[in-house]
Amino acid sequence: MTTAVTAAVSFPSTKTTSLSARSSSVISPDKISYKKVPLYYRNVSATGKMGPIRAQIASDVEAPPPAPAKVEKHSKKMEEGITVNKFKPKTPYVGRCLLNTKITGDDAPGETWHMVFSHEGEIPYREGQSVGVIPDGEDKNGKPHKLRLYSIASSALGDFGDAKSVSLCVKRLIYTNDAGETIKGVCSNFLCDLKPGAEVKLTGPVGKEMLMPKDPNATIIMLGTGTGIAPFRSFLWKMFFEKHDDYKFNGLAWLFLGVPTSSSLLYKEEFEKMKEKAPDNFRLDFAVSREQTNEKGEKMYIQTRMAQYAVELWEMLKKDNTYFYMCGLKGMEKGIDDIMVSLAAAEGIDWIEYKRQLKKAEQWNVEVY
């Protein structure tokens, strides 16, 4: 049985052949057995009829060794029974908007909204998956708009604890192009403008990259910028705001959240409540680029904040039960790599190869845009 702990959801305002290759395919005589079989040719007699001849030819060649048996992969993540692509673009699930709230301050550089949609238990997603949204209307060619994918911001139980809703965290996209025209993102504006009761077409769920690890004692390091916080909110709700018969988190969750201004901090109050609730299991660090600097006077981007704990994080990352997740703006990825390259090099380790091994072990998970 799974229940949700009562917790207020507060939101602030690549064939070639060669002679050598052919030579290597000659069969050794000691591996050939012979028997008589008829071989036909065209008789040169006046009758023109076919006549038989007999010849000694190879008929039994040693069989090649069998191919090695495939080893079944066992994921370290919560993949058992996972549902993928239940609803597709041509047959979406039509849900309804239950809640739509702006969660950035009025002076924040851009609007971000938290929205909740009903699915009545028909979209059995997992923490770390995404859903597609098909906005109403048509494109400039008169065709229905294509879906956009959004990371899910709620646990599998949803914000209301009944496993009948799904939440998204969406930033309204508005920008000025080179011609000086104001451009509005089709789907983001559609979503941010939704009123409670309005219908919305949903697809999915999709994705396995960002699923949580099974190990309840794992160390989970999460780096998110802006709306990249979405999958981590879903993780953290499961860890700290819910009670499950088959899962109790006893490890360490460490969240780094990067935003431009303090009024852009998303779900700040929720995360602070989690820290109060489980101080030994949850660490929280913000990076506010336009308001904070490091000791060198450099702007506090998420990689800058992470650099302050570089040695500690590196030691954690060398352990088999540490999982690293990154979601948000692609720009932060290089900054993180730069830090890790020097730390790894100090121990004679090639970071690029080491990261490849981490990815193979499902310990390095990235979803950036």
From Swiss-Prot:
Pathway(s): Energy metabolism; photosynthesis
PROSITE patterns found in the cross-reference section: FAD_FR
FAD-binding FR-type domain mapped to chain residues: 90-212
GO molecular function, one term: ferredoxin-NADP+ reductase activity
Organism name: Spinacia oleracea (Spinach)
Keywords, alphabetical: Chloroplast, Electron transport, FAD, Flavoprotein, Membrane, NADP, Oxidoreductase, Photosynthesis, Plastid, Thylakoid, Transit peptide, Transport
Catalytic reaction list: 2 reduced [2Fe-2S]-[ferredoxin] + NADP(+) + H(+) = 2 oxidized [2Fe-2S]-[ferredoxin] + NADPH
Protein name as it appears in the record: Ferredoxin--NADP reductase, chloroplastic
